[in-house]
Regions:
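Divalent-metal (Mg2+/Mn2+/Ca2+)-assisted nucleotide/phosphate chemistry catalytic cores
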Residues: 1-115
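Conserved nucleotide- and phosphate/pyrophosphate-binding catalytic cores
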Residues: 80-279
Length: 279
Protein backbone atom coordinates (compact mmCIF):
# COMPACT_ATOMS: atom_id res chain seq x y z
CA UNK A 1 0.00 0.00 0.00
CA UNK A 2 1.66 3.18 -1.22
CA UNK A 3 0.61 5.38 1.71
CA UNK A 4 2.27 2.96 4.13
CA UNK A 5 5.70 3.34 2.50
CA UNK A 6 7.02 6.75 3.65
CA UNK A 7 10.27 6.19 1.78
CA UNK A 8 8.36 6.99 -1.41
CA UNK A 9 7.54 10.47 -0.11
CA UNK A 10 11.17 11.13 0.73
CA UNK A 11 12.34 9.99 -2.70
CA UNK A 12 9.73 12.24 -4.30
CA UNK A 13 11.07 15.18 -2.31
CA UNK A 14 14.65 14.60 -3.50
CA UNK A 15 13.58 14.13 -7.12
CA UNK A 16 11.77 17.49 -7.11
CA UNK A 17 15.11 19.26 -7.45
CA UNK A 18 15.69 17.41 -10.72
CA UNK A 19 12.52 18.58 -12.49
CA UNK A 20 11.43 22.08 -13.51
CA UNK A 21 7.90 23.47 -13.36
CA UNK A 22 8.06 24.09 -17.10
CA UNK A 23 8.85 20.41 -17.74
CA UNK A 24 5.87 19.29 -15.67
CA UNK A 25 3.64 21.70 -17.56
CA UNK A 26 4.74 20.15 -20.86
CA UNK A 27 3.82 16.63 -19.76
CA UNK A 28 0.95 15.63 -22.11
CA UNK A 29 -0.69 13.41 -19.50
CA UNK A 30 -0.65 16.18 -16.91
CA UNK A 31 -2.06 18.69 -19.41
CA UNK A 32 -4.85 16.31 -20.38
CA UNK A 33 -5.74 15.51 -16.76
CA UNK A 34 -5.78 19.21 -15.83
CA UNK A 35 -8.35 19.89 -18.55
CA UNK A 36 -10.40 16.80 -17.75
CA UNK A 37 -10.62 17.71 -14.05
CA UNK A 38 -11.14 21.45 -14.63
CA UNK A 39 -7.96 22.35 -12.74
CA UNK A 40 -6.89 25.13 -15.14
CA UNK A 41 -7.66 27.93 -12.68
CA UNK A 42 -6.17 26.28 -9.60
CA UNK A 43 -3.89 23.25 -9.81
CA UNK A 44 -3.28 21.34 -6.54
CA UNK A 45 0.45 20.96 -5.91
CA UNK A 46 0.07 17.27 -5.12
CA UNK A 47 -1.63 16.66 -8.45
CA UNK A 48 0.88 18.76 -10.38
CA UNK A 49 3.84 16.86 -8.96
CA UNK A 50 2.24 13.45 -9.48
CA UNK A 51 4.71 12.50 -12.26
CA UNK A 52 7.55 12.91 -9.75
CA UNK A 53 5.71 10.79 -7.21
CA UNK A 54 5.17 8.15 -9.87
CA UNK A 55 8.89 8.22 -10.64
CA UNK A 56 9.53 7.43 -6.97
CA UNK A 57 7.03 4.55 -7.12
CA UNK A 58 8.91 3.05 -10.05
CA UNK A 59 12.52 3.70 -9.10
CA UNK A 60 12.14 2.71 -5.45
CA UNK A 61 11.84 -0.89 -6.60
CA UNK A 62 14.34 -0.57 -9.47
CA UNK A 63 11.74 -1.68 -11.99
CA UNK A 64 13.18 -2.39 -15.42
CA UNK A 65 9.86 -2.75 -17.24
CA UNK A 66 6.58 -0.98 -16.47
CA UNK A 67 3.30 -2.12 -18.11
CA UNK A 68 1.30 0.99 -19.02
CA UNK A 69 -1.43 2.30 -21.26
CA UNK A 70 -0.62 4.68 -24.08
CA UNK A 71 -1.66 7.71 -22.00
CA UNK A 72 1.00 6.89 -19.40
CA UNK A 73 3.97 6.83 -21.78
CA UNK A 74 4.83 10.48 -20.98
CA UNK A 75 5.02 9.52 -17.30
CA UNK A 76 7.52 6.78 -18.04
CA UNK A 77 9.60 9.16 -20.15
CA UNK A 78 9.58 11.70 -17.31
CA UNK A 79 10.78 8.96 -14.95
CA UNK A 80 13.57 8.08 -17.35
CA UNK A 81 14.64 11.73 -17.44
CA UNK A 82 14.74 11.88 -13.65
CA UNK A 83 16.83 8.71 -13.52
CA UNK A 84 19.31 10.01 -16.09
CA UNK A 85 19.59 13.36 -14.34
CA UNK A 86 20.12 11.79 -10.92
CA UNK A 87 22.70 9.31 -12.17
CA UNK A 88 24.53 12.10 -13.99
CA UNK A 89 24.56 14.54 -11.08
CA UNK A 90 25.24 12.05 -8.29
CA UNK A 91 26.02 8.41 -9.05
CA UNK A 92 24.74 5.43 -11.06
CA UNK A 93 22.19 4.34 -8.49
CA UNK A 94 18.80 4.39 -10.19
CA UNK A 95 17.57 2.00 -12.89
CA UNK A 96 16.15 3.52 -16.08
CA UNK A 97 12.87 1.70 -16.83
CA UNK A 98 11.25 0.99 -20.17
CA UNK A 99 7.54 0.92 -20.93
CA UNK A 100 5.69 -2.26 -21.84
CA UNK A 101 2.56 -1.59 -23.87
CA UNK A 102 0.01 -3.99 -25.30
CA UNK A 103 0.30 -5.11 -28.91
CA UNK A 104 -3.50 -4.85 -29.04
CA UNK A 105 -4.15 -1.27 -30.18
CA UNK A 106 -7.58 -1.19 -28.50
CA UNK A 107 -5.97 -1.81 -25.12
CA UNK A 108 -3.61 1.15 -25.39
CA UNK A 109 -6.31 3.66 -24.47
CA UNK A 110 -9.50 1.91 -23.36
CA UNK A 111 -12.32 4.50 -23.12
CA UNK A 112 -14.84 4.75 -20.33
CA UNK A 113 -18.28 3.27 -20.87
CA UNK A 114 -19.55 6.77 -21.69
CA UNK A 115 -17.12 7.02 -24.59
CA UNK A 116 -15.96 10.46 -23.48
CA UNK A 117 -12.64 9.75 -21.77
CA UNK A 118 -10.44 6.95 -20.55
CA UNK A 119 -11.88 4.59 -17.98
CA UNK A 120 -11.39 6.35 -14.65
CA UNK A 121 -12.67 5.76 -11.13
CA UNK A 122 -12.90 9.50 -10.47
CA UNK A 123 -15.06 9.98 -13.57
CA UNK A 124 -17.41 7.14 -12.66
CA UNK A 125 -17.23 5.51 -16.09
CA UNK A 126 -15.62 2.22 -15.10
CA UNK A 127 -16.42 -1.44 -15.03
CA UNK A 128 -14.97 -2.60 -11.72
CA UNK A 129 -13.52 -6.01 -11.00
CA UNK A 130 -15.77 -6.02 -7.93
CA UNK A 131 -18.97 -5.34 -9.91
CA UNK A 132 -21.71 -7.95 -9.71
CA UNK A 133 -22.89 -9.74 -12.82
CA UNK A 134 -26.00 -7.54 -12.85
CA UNK A 135 -23.98 -4.33 -12.50
CA UNK A 136 -21.66 -5.28 -15.34
CA UNK A 137 -24.60 -6.08 -17.61
CA UNK A 138 -26.30 -2.78 -16.75
CA UNK A 139 -23.14 -0.83 -17.58
CA UNK A 140 -22.53 -2.64 -20.85
CA UNK A 141 -26.13 -2.22 -21.98
CA UNK A 142 -25.81 1.53 -21.33
CA UNK A 143 -22.54 1.85 -23.27
CA UNK A 144 -22.08 4.62 -25.80
CA UNK A 145 -22.34 3.38 -29.40
CA UNK A 146 -23.31 5.28 -32.55
CA UNK A 147 -25.84 8.07 -31.91
CA UNK A 148 -26.91 7.95 -35.57
CA UNK A 149 -27.67 4.22 -35.44
CA UNK A 150 -31.32 4.68 -34.46
CA UNK A 151 -32.86 1.75 -36.32
CA UNK A 152 -31.55 -1.78 -36.77
CA UNK A 153 -31.65 -1.23 -40.51
CA UNK A 154 -29.46 1.88 -40.27
CA UNK A 155 -25.77 1.52 -41.21
CA UNK A 156 -23.65 1.83 -38.07
CA UNK A 157 -20.30 3.53 -37.53
CA UNK A 158 -17.38 1.85 -35.76
CA UNK A 159 -15.26 4.91 -35.08
CA UNK A 160 -15.87 6.17 -31.54
CA UNK A 161 -18.20 3.24 -30.88
CA UNK A 162 -17.25 2.11 -27.38
CA UNK A 163 -18.81 -1.35 -27.70
CA UNK A 164 -16.68 -2.23 -30.71
CA UNK A 165 -13.59 -0.77 -29.05
CA UNK A 166 -14.14 -3.19 -26.16
CA UNK A 167 -14.73 -6.04 -28.60
CA UNK A 168 -11.41 -5.20 -30.25
CA UNK A 169 -9.79 -5.43 -26.83
CA UNK A 170 -11.43 -8.56 -25.41
CA UNK A 171 -13.04 -10.60 -28.19
CA UNK A 172 -11.41 -13.89 -29.19
CA UNK A 173 -12.32 -16.23 -32.08
CA UNK A 174 -13.73 -18.86 -29.71
CA UNK A 175 -16.27 -16.38 -28.34
CA UNK A 176 -18.24 -16.53 -31.58
CA UNK A 177 -18.61 -20.29 -31.37
CA UNK A 178 -19.90 -20.00 -27.81
CA UNK A 179 -22.06 -16.88 -27.94
CA UNK A 180 -22.63 -15.75 -31.54
CA UNK A 181 -22.32 -18.71 -33.95
CA UNK A 182 -23.96 -16.79 -36.82
CA UNK A 183 -20.62 -15.02 -37.33
CA UNK A 184 -17.18 -16.50 -37.96
CA UNK A 185 -15.18 -13.59 -36.59
CA UNK A 186 -15.20 -9.95 -35.53
CA UNK A 187 -14.65 -8.69 -39.07
CA UNK A 188 -17.92 -10.30 -40.17
CA UNK A 189 -19.74 -8.74 -37.24
CA UNK A 190 -18.32 -5.31 -38.04
CA UNK A 191 -19.21 -5.65 -41.72
CA UNK A 192 -22.83 -6.49 -40.87
CA UNK A 193 -23.06 -3.57 -38.45
CA UNK A 194 -21.67 -1.04 -40.92
CA UNK A 195 -23.96 -2.06 -43.78
CA UNK A 196 -27.04 -2.11 -41.52
CA UNK A 197 -29.31 -4.83 -40.20
CA UNK A 198 -27.56 -5.43 -36.87
CA UNK A 199 -28.82 -3.77 -33.70
CA UNK A 200 -26.78 -2.39 -30.81
CA UNK A 201 -28.58 -4.60 -28.28
CA UNK A 202 -27.40 -7.81 -29.94
CA UNK A 203 -23.81 -6.57 -30.06
CA UNK A 204 -23.94 -5.41 -26.43
CA UNK A 205 -25.28 -8.79 -25.29
CA UNK A 206 -22.38 -10.45 -27.08
CA UNK A 207 -19.91 -8.13 -25.35
CA UNK A 208 -21.60 -8.77 -22.01
CA UNK A 209 -21.06 -12.52 -22.37
CA UNK A 210 -17.39 -11.95 -23.12
CA UNK A 211 -16.78 -9.59 -20.20
CA UNK A 212 -18.73 -11.78 -17.79
CA UNK A 213 -16.59 -14.76 -18.80
CA UNK A 214 -13.46 -12.69 -18.21
CA UNK A 215 -14.59 -11.51 -14.77
CA UNK A 216 -16.13 -14.71 -13.43
CA UNK A 217 -12.90 -16.33 -12.11
CA UNK A 218 -11.97 -12.99 -10.52
CA UNK A 219 -15.37 -12.78 -8.79
CA UNK A 220 -15.03 -16.35 -7.59
CA UNK A 221 -11.62 -15.71 -6.09
CA UNK A 222 -12.81 -12.45 -4.52
CA UNK A 223 -15.71 -14.22 -2.80
CA UNK A 224 -13.27 -16.65 -1.21
CA UNK A 225 -11.18 -13.82 0.20
CA UNK A 226 -14.29 -11.99 1.42
CA UNK A 227 -14.81 -14.90 3.82
CA UNK A 228 -11.54 -14.08 5.61
CA UNK A 229 -10.95 -10.32 5.69
CA UNK A 230 -8.24 -10.54 8.39
CA UNK A 231 -6.23 -12.73 6.01
CA UNK A 232 -6.62 -10.10 3.28
CA UNK A 233 -5.13 -7.49 5.60
CA UNK A 234 -2.39 -9.92 6.58
CA UNK A 235 -1.46 -10.38 2.91
CA UNK A 236 -1.46 -6.61 2.39
CA UNK A 237 0.65 -6.08 5.50
CA UNK A 238 3.26 -8.65 4.45
CA UNK A 239 3.42 -7.26 0.94
CA UNK A 240 3.79 -3.71 2.22
CA UNK A 241 6.53 -4.70 4.65
CA UNK A 242 8.45 -6.48 1.89
CA UNK A 243 8.04 -3.49 -0.42
CA UNK A 244 9.18 -1.10 2.28
CA UNK A 245 12.40 -3.06 2.78
CA UNK A 246 13.25 -2.68 -0.90
CA UNK A 247 12.29 1.01 -0.97
CA UNK A 248 14.35 1.68 2.16
CA UNK A 249 17.42 0.14 0.53
CA UNK A 250 16.98 2.31 -2.56
CA UNK A 251 16.48 5.40 -0.41
CA UNK A 252 19.67 4.60 1.50
CA UNK A 253 21.61 4.34 -1.78
CA UNK A 254 20.10 7.61 -3.02
CA UNK A 255 21.02 9.47 0.18
CA UNK A 256 24.49 7.99 0.10
CA UNK A 257 24.98 9.19 -3.48
CA UNK A 258 23.75 12.65 -2.47
CA UNK A 259 26.10 12.66 0.55
CA UNK A 260 23.25 13.27 3.00
CA UNK A 261 23.37 9.97 4.87
CA UNK A 262 25.16 11.72 7.73
CA UNK A 263 24.61 9.21 10.52
CA UNK A 264 25.35 6.17 8.36
CA UNK A 265 28.42 7.47 6.51
CA UNK A 266 31.21 5.68 8.35
CA UNK A 267 33.89 7.16 6.09
CA UNK A 268 32.64 10.71 6.69
CA UNK A 269 32.59 10.22 10.45
CA UNK A 270 36.10 8.74 10.33
CA UNK A 271 37.39 11.63 8.20
CA UNK A 272 35.87 14.21 10.53
CA UNK A 273 37.40 12.43 13.51
CA UNK A 274 40.86 12.54 11.92
CA UNK A 275 40.41 16.18 10.93
CA UNK A 276 39.64 17.40 14.42
CA UNK A 277 41.90 14.98 16.33
CA UNK A 278 44.17 16.83 18.71
CA UNK A 279 42.41 20.18 18.43
Amino acid sequence: IQSQIPELCELTFYYMDLVTVARLQRNPTVKSEIQMRNFEASIPVGFFTYPISQAADITAFKATTVPVGEDQLPMIEQTREIVRKFNSVYDEVLVEPSALISTNQACLRLPGIDGKAKMSKSLGNCIYLSDSEADVKKKIMSMYTDPEHLLISDPGHLEGNTVFTYLDAFCKPEHFERYLPDYANLDELKAHYTRGGLGDVKVKKFLNNIIQEELEPIRKRRKEYEKDIPEVYNILRKGTEAAREVAAQTLSEVKSAMKINYFDDVELIKAQSEKYKGI
